[in-house]
Amino acid sequence: MDYLPLFADLKQRPVLIVGGGEVAARKIELLHRAGAQVWVVAQTLSSELEQQYQDGRIHWLAQDFLPEQLDNVFLVIAATNDTVLNAAVFAAADQRCILANVVDDQPLCSFIFPSIVDRSPLVVAISSSGQAPVLARILREKLEALLPTRLSDMAAIAGRWRGRVKQHMASMGERRRFWEHAFSGRFASLISRGQLTEAENELQLSLEGQHRALGEVALVGAGPGDAGLLTLRGLQVMQQADVVLYDHLVSPEVLDLVRRDAERICVGKRAGAHSVTQEATNQLLVTLAQQGKRVVRLKGGDPFIFGRGGEELQVVAQAGIPFQVVPGVTAAAGATAYAGIPLTHRDHAQSVTFITGHCRPDGDDLDWQTLARGRQTLAIYMGTVKAAAISQQLIAHGRSSTTPVAVIGRGTRVDQQVLIGTLAQLESLAQQAPTPALLVIGEVVNLHHQIAWFGQQPQTESAISPSVVNLA
């Protein structure tokens, strides 16, 4: 270990900064967050530091550095581009046994700044001992993505409750088990949803021995396929799951991000071939949550856009099970973006309509007259089976048979395939497309040939036969 990690209490302690430029300003901002009393030695200040001085946030010594300025200073930072001055600052500090840091000059540092993940009062520091600062920054970014922002609330509440927990539980082992349960159970879940009062009530119930073994359900949108489109919140919830119920539309890459020891249950549905009935899925969500498990219902795209997520949550809510919803990138947004097809465009479409090709058996017919109007984009989910009927109805109600269309198969995935043609060719295109597929109808499809960016560049469209663009 080249450096001993320490956390210093700088509240109201004097810290000297030598230098008044941008580098000094960055260090000063960090010191402000720690509550330090900042003194700056510099002949001139940057405009940012000048404003801080006018606001009374820093003290300014408009003079050259002198060793006696280190008297009664807790630590010093040299942030100048003068190597001779920096060395003099370090030597004077070292002689007085004062911690010193010379920015970007590790040999002249008795302490170094780590990369920081700030969830105060919880703080994570990462250091490469000055050997690979970029690597430390990359690790910090990964931790930022994994650690929920609400950890600060969790740590603050835990701090307020430490005394009460200690009064109720004399044994250190008992207290440890209490907090382990709290930080991985319903208390943590309530914090993540911003329900802080309810979270403290949960702690009180646990202390009084009235805790109920009740789990929760998280309805999570997995996005259209590319694991990079999974939301940060979705990843965090998946990493906390005890059991995951997922559909066929969820890509293997997204499933790989589920907590390793979580149970995985496929309740996938395909048009006309449901492996698990919807009623059975609804009941399974309730049963698992009533067993005290954290259940993630993982759905492709966004769970509230043609995903029957609302129906499932109605059952969960009626059973009194706590739940939360994590939105996802819906297929119409993700697949079209990866295909270079904007859903709206000032010159081509002022509106977009999302349609499902599978309605309830007793559902009313679509308003084809409205859907056939020009200057709009239609994005049709699960429409390949009914592509012929869709094409016929739109043409019959006035939409031109030469209207550009795209069928995007396995959108956003490495084997994405985009088929371009006209409304008259929609049935043929749909028959060729791999599933799952999205139908896009409207003049915006023509922009595909200009702004497609994912995978191979599009082939030239044929006016006679559909063009197939394999973006693998």
UniProtKB/Swiss-Prot annotation:
InterPro entries: 4pyrrol_Mease, 4pyrrol_Methylase_sf, 4pyrrole_Mease_sub1, 4pyrrole_Mease_sub2, CobA/CysG_C, NAD(P)-bd_dom_sf, Siro_Cobalamin_biosynth, Sirohaem_synt_dimer_dom_sf. The active site is at 247 (proton acceptor), 269 (proton donor). GO terms for biological process: cobalamin biosynthetic process; methylation; siroheme biosynthetic process. Keywords: Cobalamin biosynthesis, Lyase, Methyltransferase, Multifunctional enzyme, NAD, Oxidoreductase, Phosphoprotein, Porphyrin biosynthesis, S-adenosyl-L-methionine, Transferase. PROSITE patterns: SUMT_1, SUMT_2. Residues 215-472 are annotated as: Uroporphyrinogen-III C-methyltransferase. Residues 1-203 are annotated as: Precorrin-2 dehydrogenase /sirohydrochlorin ferrochelatase. Pathway: Cofactor biosynthesis; adenosylcobalamin biosynthesis; precorrin-2 from uroporphyrinogen III: step 1/1; Cofactor biosynthesis; adenosylcobalamin biosynthesis; sirohydrochlorin from precorrin-2: step 1/1; Porphyrin-containing compound metabolism; siroheme biosynthesis; precorrin-2 from uroporphyrinogen III: step 1/1; Porphyrin-containing compound metabolism; siroheme biosynthesis; siroheme from sirohydrochlorin: step 1/1. The modification Phosphoserine is found at residue 128. NCBIfam families: cobA_cysG_Cterm, cysG_Nterm, PRK06136.1, PRK10637.1. HAMAP family: Siroheme_synth (MF_01646). PANTHER family: SIROHEME SYNTHASE (PTHR45790:SF1), SIROHEME SYNTHASE-RELATED (PTHR45790). This is Siroheme synthase 2. It comes from Yersinia pestis (strain Pestoides F).
